[in-house]
Amino acid sequence: MAKKNTTKYQSNKQEKRVAKSLDAKVTVASGALSFQKADVRSEDFLVECKTTSKNYYTLTLKTWEKIESQAVKDGIRMPLMCIDLNNGETSIAIMRQLDFIGLDYDLKAQYLGNPVPEFIDAKSVRVTADFINAPFPQQLEKGQYPCYRRDVKFLPFGTHLVMIPWEDFINISNME
């Protein structure tokens, strides 16, 4: 058992929380075994969890490509990341834009944020909660769920990712 208030402790706590929220299982040895990768496995998703005590996480294209590749090898699961900032104070879901649309998530909520991506001409992007803290000014349509959104697209690679608060991701996932 990891000592309380260590990164390992926070990571274990995050993995258990993510697994529970997805009705999934925590991967043995946190994905270190050759036959089971990533941190959490559900029927639909292969999830890589990252936690930091900072108010940002630097997501590299290499990290994303690794979970994406593992998800395909693992039985055609969708790659998903859960980034915990400030020791879990804020959690952000990151997924491919094509999966986001394929699951109709783009239709199940009203989003604050521009679905036109920020173009990232680098091999990393800083993930922060800044996009979440803006007031939600739009009038909601009946039955729509309000959700903050940030899209990024790595150039010249074309990888388009969508970031939304983890709690919103779970709520939208559970919508009919």
Model-based region annotation:
Residues 1-176:
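Catalytic phosphate/metal-binding cores of nucleic-acid and nucleotide-processing enzymes, i.e., regions
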